[in-house]
A protein has these predicted regions:
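S-adenosyl-L-methionine
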Residues: 1-16
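Mobile active-site "lid"/loop adjacent to the S-adenosyl-L-methionine
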Residues: 19-60, 77-83
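Core SAM-dependent methyltransferase catalytic element
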Residues: 20, 121-147, 152-153
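Conserved Class I S-adenosyl-L-methionine
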Residues: 46, 85-107
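Helix-to-beta-strand junctions that scaffold the AdoMet/dcAdoMet cofactor pocket
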Residues: 66-68
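Conserved beta-strand signature within the Rossmann-like core of class I S-adenosyl-L-methionine
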Residues: 71-75
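Class I S-adenosyl-L-methionine
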Residues: 99-130
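Polybasic, low-complexity RNA-engagement segments
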Residues: 133, 143-269
Length: 269
């Protein structure tokens, strides 16, 4: 997992990088009216139009990052067709995307396309028909075929071609680190410190231990090229699983480690 704090336009250089992109785009919030009076007071036709244009900018900025054949999941918490069906139609027509149908059980009471003259598959959750607040969802596929490593069964495929962003970023690794840490590097862990932390997680040899400030995170080594590519373009808030914080001369395990699947519980008798 990598957490970033960046504008969508910052992702644009990461060409053909992601297999799947989930965009829960900012919207006019009509689906929140029942539980949030503030959402009602903020609504206006002008705000709907502002949201629609913002949503399109986000999609246009991140579309190059999606691999050919990749999946875009578009969602909002609003009802109107301007921010929903009209935007899905725009993505289809502007970028040649294929709108995908989903196998949805009839008893879910999902409402389909409300745009006159269109029949592509969308999924609208209305609170008087479904459990929960208002919600909209559509799934699209980018045209083309992605070059994948048949032996890689991970959702996010590794860099496998000379011109992939991950390998290109190797040349700009130092630049990427400056983006993340504003040019200031933290000291590395000593062998003694590393030996302590390695006992806390399973298959520790598969992880890179990254120290940032007084905390240490474990990041899968197999995705270091991808991390380097992200560092070259984005502001990284957190990379990997935060496993320990330093308190005086001691290391204190973090909550994230306790609820992870890689904790060696016997390390804490």
């Amino acid at each position: 997992m990598v957490v970033t704090n960046s504008d969508p336009s910052d992702f644009t250089p990461l060409e053909d990088f992601f297999d799947v992109i989930l965009t829960d785009v900012p919207c006019s919030g009509e689906g929140m009216f029942r539980k949030d009076p503030v959402a009602i007071s903020e609504w206006s036709p002008e705000n709907v139009e502002i949201c629609r244009q913002r949503q399109r900018r986000i999609i246009a900025d991140i579309w190059p990052c999606l691999k050919p054949g990749g999946i875009l999941i578009y969602s909002t918490c609003t009802y109107n067709t301007k921010e929903n069906e009209e935007n899905i139609r725009w993505i289809r027509d502007e970028f040649g995307a294929e709108v995908l149908p989903l196998d949805v059980a009839e008893e879910w009471n999902i409402t389909g396309n409300l745009l006159q003259g269109e029949s592509f598959s969308v999924y609208r959750f209305l609170p008087h028909k479904t459990q929960g607040e208002g919600f909209f969802l559509a799934v699209l596929r980018k045209p083309g075929m992605s070059v994948r490593n048949s032996g890689d069964k991970q959702l996010i495929s590794l860099a496998i071609a000379p011109e992939t962003p991950g390998l290109r970023a190797e040349k700009s690794r130092e630049k990427g680190r400056k983006v993340q840490g504003k040019g200031k590097q933290t000291p590395g862990l000593s062998k003694e410190q590393l030996a302590i932390l390695q006992k806390w997680i399973f298959t520790a040899d598969k992880y890179e231990f990254i120290q940032k400030g007084g905390n240490v995170s474990a990041f899968p080594k197999c995705y270091l090229p991808e991390l380097s590519a992200l560092q070259s373009a984005l502001r990284i808030v957190q990379a990997g699983l935060e496993i320990a914080g330093q308190k005086g001369k001691d290391w204190v395990p973090c909550h994230a480690l306790a609820v992870s699947g890689i904790l060696v519980s016997d390390a804490f008798p």
